[in-house]
Every structure is written in C-alpha cells, then in structure tokens.
Amino acid sequence: MSLDISQFPVLAQANTPNELRQLPQALLPQVADELREFLLKSVGISSGHFASGLGTVELTVALHYVYNTPFDRLIWDVGHQAYPHKILTGRRDKMHTIRQKDGLHPFPWREESEYDTFSVGHSGTSISAALAMAIAAEKEQAGRKVVAVIGDGAMTGGMVFEAMNHAGDLHNDMLVVLNDNEMSISENVGALNNHLAQLMSGRFYTTLREGGKKVLKGMPVIKEMAKRTEEHLKGMVVPGTLFEELGFNYIGPIDGHDVDALVETMRNMRNLKGPQVLHIMTKKGRGYEPAEKDPIGWHAVPKFDPSLFKKPATKPGLPTFSQVFGKWLCDIAEQDEKVLAITPAMREGSGMVEFSQRFPKQYFDAAIAEQHAVTLSAGFACEGFKPVVAIYSTFLQRAYDQLIHDVALQQLPVLFAIDRGGIVGADGPTHQGAFDLSFMRCIPNMVIMAPSDENECRQMLYTGYCYDAGPSAVRYPRGCATGATQVEAMTALPIGKGVIKRVGKRIAILNFGTLLASALTAAESLDATVVDMRFVKPLDVDLVKEMAQTHEVLVTVEENAIMGGAGAGVLEQLQKLRMPKAVLQIGLPDEFIKHGSPEEVTHDLQLDAEGILAQINAYLAQ
C-alpha cells in the first residue's frame, strides 16, 4: 500500500532530482520536513532500516539540489541511510515494497536506478569507488563531480584510510561527506561553525589561499609560517587535522540538519580543487523521539504504527540462534576467565549484550574492522587465552586472509561463532551467508561444524571451546531456533562424527545444518535414511562410506553454495574411495540470492521440505 502523496504537497513536486532543483531554495526546509514524514510512514508500512535515514534527510535534499545527479556521481557507504535518496530519485511510489520479494532493493543498487552509481551493503567501500570515478571524470574531462557519503561508524575500517591516503596522494577533485551522528549537535556546531565553513569554502578565501601559495613559493620560511597560522586558526574550531594530514582539505563540522547551510557550503565546495572533506553533525532518528532516544533499537524495524511511538511487542517464542550463542558464552565465561569475546561492531546482532555487561573485561568490540578482529583473536590465542570471534558469515569474507594467514596457518585455537549462515532474507545478496562453508572448507587445520538445532549448537560451541589443535567454526542461521529440548550440561562432541536420525531404504540424505527438519519430512515420503552429518570438516568418512555401500542414491542438503560446499566434500571423499555413486547436491545455486522473506527465499530455492522432496523425485525420474 503506497502513501497518498497529496498529503505531502511540496514533496509531490520533487519526484526526481531535476524536479527538486526547479524548486526555490526557500522551500527546501519544507521538502525536508515532508520527506522525513513520508519516510516515517513508509517504513511503518514496509519495515526496514529506519533511524539512519531519518538522520540524512536534509543532507540528501542538499546533495541532490546542489549536484547534477545522476551526471554527478553520488555514492552512499553501506546504504542504510539511503532511503531518502530512493524517495527523491523516482522510487517514491515503490517505497512500500522495499526489502520485500520483487520489491525495491534494501540498499543502493546499480540495476535498480541510474542514480545508484555503486551497489553497496558492506561498509567502507564508498571512498575507493569515488576515487576511481573522480579519476575517470578527469580523464573524460566531462566536468563531472563525485561525492561519497560515509558515516562515522564506517570510518573505523582500514579500507577507508587506505582510500583516503591514495586520494590525498593523487589529488583528484572529489568530496567526502562525513556524516557524524555519534554525538548530538553541540553549541560549537551552530551558527559560528556554519558561517566559518561557508567562509572557508568560499571563492574569496580559496582564491586568497591559492594566490598566497604562489606568492610565497619562493619564500619557504614565510610560507611555512603562513601555513601554520592557518592550521592554528582552523584548529581552534575545526577537528580536521587527521584529514589534512591525509591530503584532504577539511571543512566543518556543520549542522547536518540545517539544509540552507548545507546547500551554501556545498555550492562553495563544488568547485574546489583536490580532495575535500565536509564534516556534518547529524542525529540518528531525527524527528521521531523514540528513535532519537534509542537509535540502535530503531536501526531496523518491523512494520509499526508511528503514532503509537513504540515498536510492536514481540510475541514470546523460541530463542534465536544468536541468543543461544549469547547464553552459552555467558555460561562458559562463568567457568573460565580466559574466555575472551571479540566482535566487529555486532554486539546486538550477535547476542552479546548481556556478555558485554556482565564480563566487560573479557569483551572486545573491534568496531567495523573484521581483519583486525580476527588477528586480534590470533594474538590472544598466542598468549594462552580462549578467543571467541562472533561474526556474521557475510562479514567473515572480509577477513579471509587473516583467517588463513594469522589463525589457521599457526594452528591457533580460535573459535568462530558464525552467525547468519545461509539465507538471511530481506537484506538480500550482500548479506546472504552463502559462501562460508565453501571458503573455509579448503583451509587446512580448520574444524567446521553445522548444528541442526539449538542444543547441538550449544554442544558444538563447547566442542570448539575445548578443541586446542587449531581453529574451529560453528555456523548457524539467522532467526529462531527449532524448539529442541536444550540440555544445559555441555559435552564435547567426537570430532568428525555424524549421527543417523532415520533409517530407510535406497536413498540416504546427508544433512548439514538446520535444514534437518525439512529433510526428515521429505524422507517420510521417500522412506529415506537421514543422517545429521554435524561436521563439514573433518567429514565422517566412515559414515559416508557406509551410506554409499547400503544405498543407491545419496543426497546432500546444505544452506550454502553447492559449489565447493559440504556436498562437494562428500563427492571428493567418494572419488577418493573409488566409489562411483549417484549423488544429488541440494543447496544454494550458482547465483547471488535476491532479497525476500527467509520463508519465500527458501521456498523459491526448493530448500523447504516440499522443495527437497521435489528435487529428489525429479532426480530419480531422470
């Protein structure tokens, strides 16, 4: 259900940036107010990322008003904050479909709009892409401008500084907008700083500055004195030393909710030469009191009624796998003070809030720096501690070299608790945990476990904790657990051993992970044997051999890419054993998995009980 645009009379006149730029600047504050109200009501209908977008309304209006998008390139880092951008770029009437099957993509996406110049979803990529586009613009001599928008959280990633260091060296024309919502608008980020930013980005100041450089070129002592005087003057009100050292001209900080100040400053900066940083201060959740007070809790929301000023109460139900992990982590930390938990800025999502509060000296948030987080854990392991890295499957990809070089190569006992393995649903292809079994399985010294339910997850975590011959990984999905009876006592499982769950004939289903219930349901119709393999690596070779000897067809089931996944491991073992056998591999196809609810995606990929049965019957009919 789309919103009635007649409720937003000024916003109705700005369905595209071209239409926005036709409006008088005096109307921009009203555009921003109506855009914020539209966003509020739209996300209430659709669900989605919420607080970040509320904080970037004025910035989005100013960017599209000053810059000639899409000719000028605008790149959003991560993309949580880009909902206002989607609304202003011709997608207003489809906002109620965002993150839903066949609806708008959750992040900026090149295939969706010409205004989305770079597809995003992970943090820290915007400045590298913007630099490349700035270099291309200079080569084409088309007069194209390039802007990257990045949040203060993403600035903790090393890739950001690699890109800024390179950009400062090359000195191409580009603008980086640092959207700083870490603190509220303080007194010094008001009229004085807004005025100073406009002054220092204005033509008179920059002409005087560049002309002075030429005059003083032959007088190095005086030139150095002038440079230091300017730096001291700026340093009185400007916290930009780091950016200046990287070769960027720094302007700010200014109020990111003053659309007129943003427009005037950007107009001045649009024609500045070289790399520029505009530092703006914003407030996450701006304009909606509950989100302002709790921006983390309102980062992403289900469907809700904005007039109630609260999110819908969650119905009591099964714990999530993240909560199962969080409870296990607290339980094991009570027994062992050498347990250290590391996460790259995923405390809430990984179920670590209670642990961080109860065991603050054993908790390390490495920020959005996955490479650092993994090598930090390696260092802890070297010193005899028991590091546990809680990380999403999709983000572990970013630390692959560290996993190999710093952990596995040294056979260090680091336990990886890999959340969001498999289908995550609405966040789409940038966040599906499709590849972890494949990219870990080829690493020597790794033990990889895939629990079928929450009790097995708890026992596997304990198994990884006890294992000291190298790294281990427990890989579990997003969402609620299965309802299995949880055993509080923790027992280490025998490494590399599976369990037969159902005895049948002719067909043996070898299941890896939480698709076990669906596999068992499908097996009832087929009278098939079902095995909970538990270990992806080392594989239970004896059990695979037994199943191959006693059944005509083997079926492997996993919520991972078929290529290189657990099923591929079964085929490799059969080949090694010289046992030719009909094997059907069921898993994720060789494509990036689109967004939709987990149930919809699972059904479309034929990974539910009905789909597994259909795939097996189709294979048998060949």
From Swiss-Prot:
Give the pathway listed in the UniProt entry for this protein: Metabolic intermediate biosynthesis; 1-deoxy-D-xylulose 5-phosphate biosynthesis; 1-deoxy-D-xylulose 5-phosphate from D-glyceraldehyde 3-phosphate and pyruvate: step 1/1
Gene Ontology biological-process annotations: 1-deoxy-D-xylulose 5-phosphate biosynthetic process; isopentenyl diphosphate biosynthetic process, methylerythritol 4-phosphate pathway; terpenoid biosynthetic process; thiamine biosynthetic process
Q: Which InterPro entries match?
A: Dxylulose-5-P_synthase, THDP-binding, Transketo_C/PFOR_II, Transketolase-like_Pyr-bd, Transketolase_BS, Transketolase_C, Transketolase_CS
Question: What is the reaction catalyzed?
Answer: D-glyceraldehyde 3-phosphate + pyruvate + H(+) = 1-deoxy-D-xylulose 5-phosphate + CO2
Identify the residues that bind thiamine diphosphate.
Answer: H80, G121, H122, S123, G153, A154, N181, Y288, E370
Q: Which SMART domains match?
A: Transket_pyr
One example of the protein's molecular function in GO is: magnesium ion binding
- Matching CDD domains, A to Z? TPP_DXS, TPP_PYR_DXS_TK_like
Organism superkingdom: Bacteria
Q: Which SUPFAM superfamilies match?
A: Thiamin diphosphate-binding fold (THDP-binding) (SSF52518), TK C-terminal domain-like (SSF52922)
Tell me which residues bind Mg(2+).
D152, N181
Q: Which cofactor does it need?
A: Mg(2+); thiamine diphosphate
EC identifiers of the protein? 2.2.1.7
Q: How is the cofactor bound?
A: Binds 1 Mg(2+) ion per subunit. Binds 1 thiamine pyrophosphate per subunit.
Pfam families reported for this sequence? DXP_synthase_N, Transket_pyr, Transketolase_C
Keywords of the record, alphabetical order, are: Isoprene biosynthesis, Magnesium, Metal-binding, Thiamine biosynthesis, Thiamine pyrophosphate, Transferase
Q: Which family does it belong to?
A: Belongs to the transketolase family. DXPS subfamily.
Quaternary state and interactors: Homodimer.
Q: What does this protein do?
A: Catalyzes the acyloin condensation reaction between C atoms 2 and 3 of pyruvate and glyceraldehyde 3-phosphate to yield 1-deoxy-D-xylulose-5-phosphate (DXP).
- Its name, as the record gives it, is 1-deoxy-D-xylulose-5-phosphate synthase
Species of provenance: Shewanella baltica (strain OS185)
Question: What lineage does the source organism belong to?
Answer: Bacteria, Pseudomonadati, Pseudomonadota, Gammaproteobacteria, Alteromonadales
